[in-house]
Amino acid sequence: DTITRLARTFITSEQVPLIPADLNLQKPLVELPDLILENALASWQQLIRDGEGLHGIAYDRLLTDLAANQQVVVCVDTVHGASRRYISRLLNNPPQERLILLRDNEDPTFGGIAPEPSSANMQPTIRALADRSEPLKIGAIIDPDGDRIRFTDGTIEISMNQFGAMAYHFLHEIKGKQGMVAKTVASSNLANALARQ
């Protein structure tokens, strides 16, 4: 409700309080004074590293283990979206022979498909994993702006909402984590239902 209210206020007003009145938004970013560039992926990775004591995710160890484990193959379909630029770095550039990237080139038409992490669009990932001999298979398809994802082990598919519910359950019941649950607009109310339990 707060986000919607603020967005409506900003849209209808002449001035947005978070943007200086003298800032010319028609200028290229490189010409804007005092602009501080941010590496969003590196910042996120540092937040995860710094928060290990809170959430228990040993990010660097996970990446090292992934790179060293010859039994694992990962296949990610970015559907020509912006996330295509970050997947390898997100996973700390694992061996290329065990990281399959599908539809990872720029294509503003998204190859003529609806660029969503649907079961139909997951099929190339499933086929790519079926051709692999590694016993542990992780597949994912990510929508173009990277906020929706679907997973597979090559056989079973797990939607974003199912994964979220499983993760919440694991964090609360197995890891004993307590606190608020955050979710996106695209998420279902499955997390809400679990939180009420």
Task: Set out the residue ranges of the language-model regions.
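Proline/glycine-rich low-complexity loops and linkers
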Residues: 2-44, 154-197
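Acidic, glycine-rich loop-and-beta core segments that form the ion-binding/anion-interacting portion
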Residues: 100, 111-194
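Gly/Ser/Thr-enriched, mixed-charge loops and adjacent short helices
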Residues: 1-133
